[in-house]
Amino acid sequence: MSKLTHIDDQGRARMVDVSEKPATAREAVAAGFVRMSAETLALAISGSGRKGDVRAVAELAGVMAAKKTSDLIPLCHPLALSKVEVAVEPADGGLSVTARVKTTGPTGVEMEALTAASVACLTIYDMLKAAEKGMVIEAVRLLEKTGGKSGDWKADQP
């Protein structure tokens, strides 16, 4: 098993020193899913929910969240993100969220992509909870990452 990079030899949490790492192109894609009834999905698609356009607001929330990742995850580095794209699309049984994040820097953007997808899912739940409290947020995961010392990685399909 690989050594955990955020734990020092004494078992204490630490922020990884990336000052000697070269700036390279990095990209990560994460996804999530909010399972809901057909009635709630129709409400989300129509854009006529009480709080407004669910998909547009969730996409914006995901973008904002990616930019705030280092404020939320204690050992994440603050990064200058060059692109954040969040898409919320209707799917069988709910809304599918995909977040794509890019940077050129010394560390990857996996956490930013995961944070964007997670917060977009939470925003969907918040905006539709008046219609259905039993929605389920599921399958939040990293789909792929490119760049960096560890190279490219892609998740096995579902």
From Swiss-Prot:
> Which Gene3D superfamilies does its entry note?
Molybdopterin cofactor biosynthesis C (MoaC) domain
Q: Point out the signal peptide segment.
A: none
A Gene Ontology molecular function term of the record: cyclic pyranopterin monophosphate synthase activity
Which InterPro entries does this entry report, sorted A to Z?
A: MoaC, MoaC_bact/euk, MoaC_sf, MoCo_biosynth_MoaA/MoaC, Mopterin_CF_biosynth-C_dom
Supply the EC number(s): 4.6.1.17
**Residues where substrate binds:** L75, C76, H77, M111, E112
Gene Ontology biological process terms, A to Z? Mo-molybdopterin cofactor biosynthetic process
Q: What reaction does this catalyse?
A: (8S)-3',8-cyclo-7,8-dihydroguanosine 5'-triphosphate = cyclic pyranopterin phosphate + diphosphate
Q: Pfam families from the entry?
A: MoaC
- Superkingdom assignment: Bacteria
Annotated keywords = Lyase, Molybdenum cofactor biosynthesis
The catalytic residues are D126
Pathway(s) of this molecule: Cofactor biosynthesis; molybdopterin biosynthesis
Does the record carry Lyase as a key word?
A: yes
Q: What does this protein do?
A: Catalyzes the conversion of (8S)-3',8-cyclo-7,8-dihydroguanosine 5'-triphosphate to cyclic pyranopterin monophosphate (cPMP).
Family listed: Belongs to the MoaC family.
The record's note on quaternary structure and interaction partners says: Homohexamer; trimer of dimers.
Name the UniProt record assigns to this protein: Cyclic pyranopterin monophosphate synthase
Q: Which organism does this record belong to? A: Caulobacter vibrioides (strain NA1000 / CB15N)
